[in-house]
């Protein structure tokens, strides 16, 4: 908003008055650098000689080597999703798992229920770390001004994780970003959060650093075809249905493996472009093919940088008839849709790896 008096919404089922403000935030991240708080992520710490063995058991994905990060689904015994997590390895006996803050208690109970056969110490450290993410083509330039470590692309690669001082503050830095841009998640103790914010804002002045919010973040992930936990990824769905099976390591044993291997659902997470001018999906809208319902919306909105209305849907692929258009019903009206074949923004992923 331009000022405090301007910071309000007006109830509407169409695009709200904040639409243009969110667009400005997205464009600044894509072209310069932005900053957003990430204190909401959960942080689960595992230490001990069996730390890797334990995580290999509960995680379906391949675990990272020391200094690296991997993305991994976590499955239930029924082969359904119970987590979409980021795993950081500090050394062979120490890991930090980052996940949804909303699901942290569910994940805590799940981890604790499987600890008894392993020599591993587990602690939920979510309240001990807050954090800020910086993202955009100038984010490295900002970081370089307030660290002593070499954070060049050669020395601090995409999906690296390190402990270092940032603006004099001890931090954990993960080189990842939910925006699809070059970016860093910087985690610090809560009492350092304001200091970190001030250091980043001061260092980023010459690069036009500006805060951005959750709506901008969710818009940017739509442009990358990335689902979100509680919306597109949830315990109702399998890894195969959501496309998260691409992260599964089938060469090891893990909870839910046999169920996941035998799963044969024809329902798939399918991103769509929606042909609409002033209204977007939220969730649970019907997806139609002719006069037949073939699925439903799990999330969506406006992808500001590519200027498209996007819907993430679960569609039964066996019900699609090619002679009929795919449409979504929004507020009683049907809107034509087309399937998104590849990410609308930076499909090769070069920007976040640069």
Model-derived regions, located:
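Glycine/proline-enriched, intrinsically flexible loops and inter-domain linkers
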Residues: 1-354
């Amino acid at each position: 908003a331009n000022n405090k008096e301007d910071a309000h919404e007006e109830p509407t089922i169409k695009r709200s008055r904040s639409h243009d403000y969110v667009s400005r935030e997205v464009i600044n991240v894509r072209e310069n650098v932005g900053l957003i708080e990430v204190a909401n992520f959960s942080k689960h710490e595992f230490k001990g000689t069996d730390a890797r063995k334990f995580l290999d058991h509960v995680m379906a994905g391949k675990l990272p080597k020391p200094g690296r990060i991997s993305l991994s689904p976590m499955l239930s015994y029924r082969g359904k999703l119970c987590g979409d997590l980021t795993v950081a390895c500090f050394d062979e006996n120490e890991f930090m798992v980052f996940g949804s803050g909303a699901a942290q208690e569910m994940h805590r109970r799940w981890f604790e229920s499987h600890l008894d056969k392993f020599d591993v110490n587990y602690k939920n450290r979510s309240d001990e770390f807050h954090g800020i993410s910086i993202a955009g083509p100038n984010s490295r330039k900002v970081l370089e001004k307030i660290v002593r470590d070499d954070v060049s692309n050669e020395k601090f690669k995409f999906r690296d994780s390190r402990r270092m001082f940032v603006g004099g503050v001890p931090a954990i830095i993960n080189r990842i970003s939910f925006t699809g841009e070059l970016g860093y998640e910087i985690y610090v103790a809560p009492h350092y959060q304001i200091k970190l914010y001030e250091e980043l804002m001061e260092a980023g002045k010459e690069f036009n650093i500006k805060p951005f919010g959750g709506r901008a973040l969710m818009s940017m992930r739509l442009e990358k075809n990335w689902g979100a936990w509680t919306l597109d990824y949830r315990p109702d769905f399998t890894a195969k249905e959501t496309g998260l099976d691409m992260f599964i390591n089938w060469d090891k044993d893990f909870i839910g493996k046999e169920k996941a291997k035998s799963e044969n659902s024809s329902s798939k997470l399918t991103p769509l472009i929606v042909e609409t001018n002033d209204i977007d999906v939220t969730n649970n809208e019907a997806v139609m093919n002719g006069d037949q319902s073939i699925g439903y919306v799990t999330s969506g909105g406006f992808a500001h940088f590519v200027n498209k209305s996007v819907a993430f849907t679960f569609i039964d692929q066996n019900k699609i008839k090619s002679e009929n258009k795919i449409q979504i019903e929004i507020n009683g009206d049907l809107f034509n849709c087309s399937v998104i074949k590849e990410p609308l923004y930076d499909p090769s992923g070069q920007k976040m790896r640069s």
